[in-house]
Amino acid sequence: MPVSASLAYKNYDYDYDSIQPYFYFDNDDEDFYHHQQGQPQPPAPSEDIWKKFELLPTPPLSPSRRQSLSTAEQLEMVSEFLGDDVVNQSFICDADYSQSFIKSIIIQDCMWSGFSAAAKLEKAVSERLASLHAARKELISDSSSNRLSASYLQDLSTSASECIDPSVVFPYPLTESSKSNKVAPSQPMLVLDTPPNSSSSSGSDSEDEEEEEEEEEEEEEEEEEEEEEEEIDVVTVEKRQKRNEADVSDSRYPSPLVLKRCHVSTHQHNYAAHPSTRHDQPAVKRLRLETSSSNRHGKQRKCTSPRTSDSEDNDKRRTHNVLERQRRNELKLSFFALRDEIPEVANNEKAAKVVILKKATECIHSMQLDEQRLLSIKEQLRRKSEQLKHRLQQLRSSH
């Protein structure tokens, strides 16, 4: 809070006589129906009703029980504030800001704007600021001025803390110089330094918000990875263990996100390629090698890691993938062999499986008809041969 406002609250110059016209007319002996002549009366309903609200702002805090400070002590107190750089940055505003503060001394209050009380208050504050600037110039030239004791400074800090925080009233920051970012070389993360008059809860709140945002990002990444892992059919994918959320909540400074590259072993099959006769034996060898290697890796993981259920699931999934890959390869080879047996699609390497099956069905029906026709011809020829044999025997017997 600016020291001008705190001093205006602490050392106020108004007495009852100067502010008496701004209060309500209150008389205990007054009769509201028979007003006495020659005495000031409250405003009638026809008059401006807003004149009732021409009051000064909230009165300052009650004065302390200590003796009032003399003029020299007050100037010493001001010099103490003006001499310290840290306090000067956080408590004392610039010249531009003081002008804007005078212009907007009453902010966000529709009851005070545009009245004579606001003008008088601004005039008093401007006079106070002018006197403070003059005192500061005089005290800076005097290098042998004595420092104020710690009790006075503590009293001023407590009185400033009891006043309203200007960040609640003013929507914009006080000074840009008071908000500086400092990087600690020993820590990988940024630490923000707060002004001296700010509360310590703001830093903890910002750190909690950062931790919550990082936890949300990690949960989203883990959900995406789980969705990708649910679609495993043939390709072997190693499931990464989920990060324990208790470690994230317990850690005071969360560690930055680490992105790891995982190699996914994929086997692409060219279904349009010509079938090879040397494919069956290497497939069996590869199956044995992969099963043996998977069993060996599974045993090592069982010995090293306590989570044996995950390793067993990985071994089962890997074995299932190998068997499924072998089954698909055998099915593909059988389709290639069937395609080569059908004359219509034998030369078409890009024939679809449905076309191969349809042409194979038609070819089978035509072959069955040909078989029946040939069987009937064979039967006719057999009968004819029997007749010829019987006639030949008759001719031999006659001779």
From Swiss-Prot:
Q: Where is the composition biased (Acidic residues)?
A: 205-233
Q: Which CDD domains match?
A: bHLHzip_c-Myc (cd11458)
Which residues, renumbered to this chain, are glycosylated? 58
**GO (cellular component) term, any one:** nucleus
Pfam families in UniProt: HLH, Myc-LZ, Myc_N
Localization, UniProt: Nucleus
First-listed, main subcellular location of the protein, grouped into a coarse class? nucleus
Region annotation Leucine-zipper: where it falls in the sequence: 374-395
Keywords, in A-Z order: Activator, DNA-binding, Glycoprotein, Nucleus, Transcription, Transcription regulation
* Motif (9aaTAD) on chain: 76-84
Chain intervals with Basic and acidic residues compositional bias? 236-250
Output the InterPro entries linked to this UniProt entry.
bHLH_dom, HLH_DNA-bd_sf, Myc-LZ, Myc_transcription_factors, Tscrpt_reg_Myc, Tscrpt_reg_Myc_N
Summarizing the function annotation, the protein's role is: Transcription factor that binds DNA in a non-specific manner, yet also specifically recognizes the core sequence 5'-CAC[GA]TG-3'. Activates the transcription of growth-related genes.
Instruction: Tell me what this protein is called.
Output: Transcriptional regulator Myc
Species source reads: Carassius auratus (Goldfish)
